[in-house]
From Swiss-Prot:
Its EC number is 7.-.-.-. It comes from the Bacteria. It is an enzyme of class 7 (translocase). PANTHER family: ELECTRON TRANSPORT COMPLEX PROTEIN RNFD, ION-TRANSLOCATING OXIDOREDUCTASE COMPLEX SUBUNIT D. GO terms for cellular component: plasma membrane. It holds the Pfam family NQR2_RnfD_RnfE. This is Ion-translocating oxidoreductase complex subunit D. Belongs to the NqrB/RnfD family. Keywords: Cell inner membrane, Cell membrane, Electron transport, Flavoprotein, FMN, Membrane, Phosphoprotein, Translocase, Transmembrane, Transmembrane helix, Transport. It comes from Shigella dysenteriae serotype 1 (strain Sd197). GO terms for biological process: electron transport chain; transmembrane transport. Part of a membrane-bound complex that couples electron transfer with translocation of ions across the membrane. Required to maintain the reduced state of SoxR. It is a multi-pass membrane protein.
């Protein structure tokens, strides 16, 4: 009998980076569809702007660095960066904002470090945070979901608002943000934080139209459930591992439950945390970035739990209504330390 001698590794994963990125893009379809349904065509326009900007920015840098443009663009990482940023910002944000954020994410947060695999921070979240800090008003100007909105825009009107700031009939963001109660609407998390600080009781807050959903905020609960469905599909396809999403969601739910039990007058209930904002998007599509997340199983559990704790702390006591982006970046900082202390022991070697 003849034995073939082969060098390690002895097991192989045939999935290329482009294949994994494509799976993530496909898994985003339910979440995108839900955002289109509840927040209008602006989401699609932002995705198109971000995608084109990401591809052009990456191609420009690769050309300047004299690297293969076609081969690198085929990995779909630039497209995914643009997509994640586009679905994270308000659907009617000015066109130049998504372009600026995407270009910053690709050139500064990714290519400046050497490209895919070298960046320590999630590029899409870097772009988001830069926009949020620089343009807080525009970045928090979300439309009310269609079920409680007074004005529902068509595709052409959405384009006009994004590029000119008003509709053909003269409507602007102030009128478009009005809900059925005649009050400018915000996200469920933003509404809760602002109302508590204004001295409103939780009973009063829960009567607002934005909380007319079955489980959490109107529209937002279904958007989060759609992102959850896409995330479960990614797990089924084995494109991501379960450790980070599970530890993130369990930690966030546990902290929110304990906080709500001890201080129900000032802290949001767990279902609002889990089904509002970017919770499910962050859990399955952002935190699971293989480049910027921990690489060991124990490390992934710690990484996800840390992010969940940070999200709850920022939402409950910080200055921003949704803390997913900041939590992701802060958790990214700790990855080298987490990996160092959770790396598995080499068989046959003792510690120390």
């Amino acid at each position: 009998m003849v034995f073939r001698i082969a060098s390690s590794p002895y097991t192989h994963n045939q999935r290329q980076t482009s294949r994994i990125m494509l799976l993530v893009l496909l898994a985003a379809v339910p979440g995108i569809a839900a955002q289109l349904w509840f927040f209008g065509w602006g989401t699609l326009v932002q995705i198109l702007l971000a995608s084109v900007s990401a591809l052009l920015a990456e191609a420009l840098v690769l050309k300047l660095r004299k690297q293969s443009v076609a081969a690198t663009l085929k990995d779909n990482s630039a497209l995914l960066t643009g997509l994640l940023l586009a679905v994270s910002i308000p659907p009617l944000a000015p066109w130049w904002m998504v372009v600026l954020g995407t270009v910053f994410a690709v050139i500064i947060a990714k290519q400046l470090y050497g490209g895919l695999g070298q960046n320590p921070f999630n590029p899409a979240m870097i772009g988001y945070v830069v926009l949020l800090i620089s343009f807080p008003v525009q970045m928090t100007s979300w439309l009310p979901p269609h079920e409680i909105a007074v004005n529902i825009l068509g595709f052409i009107d959405a384009i006009q608002v994004i590029f000119s700031g008003h509709t053909a009939s003269g409507g602007d963001m102030n009128t478009l943000r009005l809900g059925i109660d005649g009050i400018s609407q915000a996200t469920p998390l933003d509404t809760f934080k602002t109302s508590v600080r204004a001295g409103h009781s939780v009973e009063q807050i829960m009567q607002y139209p934005i909380y007319s959903g079955i489980l959490a905020g109107a529209g937002w609960q279904w958007v989060n459930l759609a992102w959850l469905a896409g995330g479960v599909w990614l797990l089924w396809q084995k494109a991501i591992r379960w450790h980070i999403p599970l530890s993130f969601l369990v930690t966030l739910a546990l902290c929110a439950t304990l906080g709500w039990l001890f201080s129900p007058e000032t802290l949001a209930a767990p279902q609002i945390h889990l089904l509002s904002g970017a919770t499910m998007l962050g859990a399955f599509f952002i935190l699971t970035d293989p480049v910027t997340a921990s690489t060991t199983n124990r490390g992934r559990l710690i990484f996800g739990a840390l992010a969940g704790l940070l999200v709850w702390l920022i939402r409950s006591f910080g200055g921003y209504p949704d803390g997913v982006a900041f939590a992701v970046l802060l958790a990214n900082i700790t990855v080298p330390l987490i990996d160092y202390y959770t790396r598995p022991r080499v068989y046959g070697h003792r510690k120390g």
